[in-house]
Each structure stands twice: as structure tokens, then as C-alpha cells.
Amino acid sequence: MNPGELNRAELAQLAMMLEVSAYPKPGNVDRCHDYPDTRLEHFLASIILARPALQRAGEASAGVGEIIYEAVDLSSVHSGGNTHFGAFILLVPLMMGGGISGATRVVHETTVDDAVDFYRAFGKTKVRVLSGDELDVNDPEVYEELRRRGMNLYDVMLHSASNDMVAREWVNGFALTRRTADRLWEEGCGRDSIVKTFLWLLSVEPDTFVIKKHGQDTAWEVMTKAMEVREGLRDLETFDAECIRKRINPGSIADIIIASIYVALCEGWQWDC
């Protein structure tokens, strides 16, 4: 498929669909298993319902924060909780900027209003946050505090980057997204390459969502086991089942994978082979 045949919104939807359809990806919802409170159809509904916001992102017709809020708002009508918040945080600037270099410019040009809209979106999700953050999404005064400090959305991501790998992409030029897209190309085409790329990323980067929910030790244990799978020392499906049983869901890794698939698709990477 020629990427020129699809617009940016369609490519973003395709990237999200390919990520959730690939299996097995240890701990993630996919076509083979759900969690009791979040199912495959919740992810698919989110992908479909977010289309108007993704269209605006592709046209760069509104601010980053406003579009992220709209995407979350449109996709939050189901009961499955947060499905694509992290993915929207990455996809929106990538779409608005036409790629990684443009996205880097876009994030630096964000405004205080973008930050406020982002926090409004954050408040609609059930994303786990670390306690004690001075910019607590649950604090009703947080919007005024953002304005008092003059913090734009890039500043907010900089504030969070030390403990959130999605925020970190904003401040390091989407470096991990680039590395992961390159890895996807190296692994070849189609679904199996997505699974292999996911396992590679899981083995080299501690998932910050896992850290927030289960702690640093569990995140490092997951990395070690993912490496053992890659080295043929551990069975992939057994590892997947263990993660599901313990509700260890590498959700931030999945967000990076979505962004990387989007970048690769824009470059002509083939999913249907």
C-alpha cells in the first residue's frame, strides 16, 4: 500500500488498529485476551470514535491540547477506561508536524492553553499518577497554577519526563519513537514484525506505566523476561499469560509502538504482506 493513498488520520487509525491486533504482546489486550474491565472492542471503538479529532490533527486546524482533549472526549464514551491517551499524546504532534522533525517544532510552540486543555483531558481518563505531584490533575487549582507559572504543554511534559516515557518523547525529539520505527523496518513487514519490535522494546526499556502500578522491580523483571523470550530461554505465550494473570500491562510501550507504526507507515512500511 502506498502511504500517499491514505491521509494522516487514516494512517493514525491504521497504526492503532495494527498495534492492538498484533499478538501475543505480553500483558496487553489483544485479539486473544481481554482484561475484565477493558476489552478489545473498547480499543477498536476508541480508534473509530476519535476520527474527527485525528482529522483535525492531520489538518493542524487547532491547538495540540485542544485536539488531545477532543480525542479523549470522543473516545471516552465506552466503559473500558483509558485506551489511547498516551497514543494521542504522541500521535497528535506527529500528525500536526508531518513527521518527527515537524513534531519537535510543534511541541516547542505549544501554549499555556494547550497545557490547560491537556489537563482537562487528563482529568477525563483513569490514568494512574504518582502521588505527591505538585501539579496534581485531581487538584481543582491546577489550571490556575499552570497559568500562574506560565507553563506551556512542553513544560508540562518536561516536568513529567523523568517518570513517564511518553512525556519523555516530547522533550527528547521523539528519539525512542524513531529508534522503534527503525527497528520495525529491520524486523520486516506485517504482524510478526510488530510483535518482535514490541518484545525488543520491552526488553530494553522499563515501562513507566508498569512502574507506576507495580514498582521498579517488577518493571525490570519484565525487561529481563522479555530478553529471555528473545533469546529463546522463555516461552512467549507463557510469559504473556503470566503478565495477564498478574495484570502487568506495559501500556506505555504500546503507546510508543503505535507512534512508531505511524511513523513507519508514513515512510512506506508495509503491514499487509
Regions found by a protein language model. Give the residues of each.
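Long, hydrophobic/aromatic-enriched structural stretches that serve as scaffold segments
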Residues: 52-102
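Conserved phosphate/anionic-ligand binding catalytic regions in large, soluble enzymes, centered on
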Residues: 79-92, 246-262
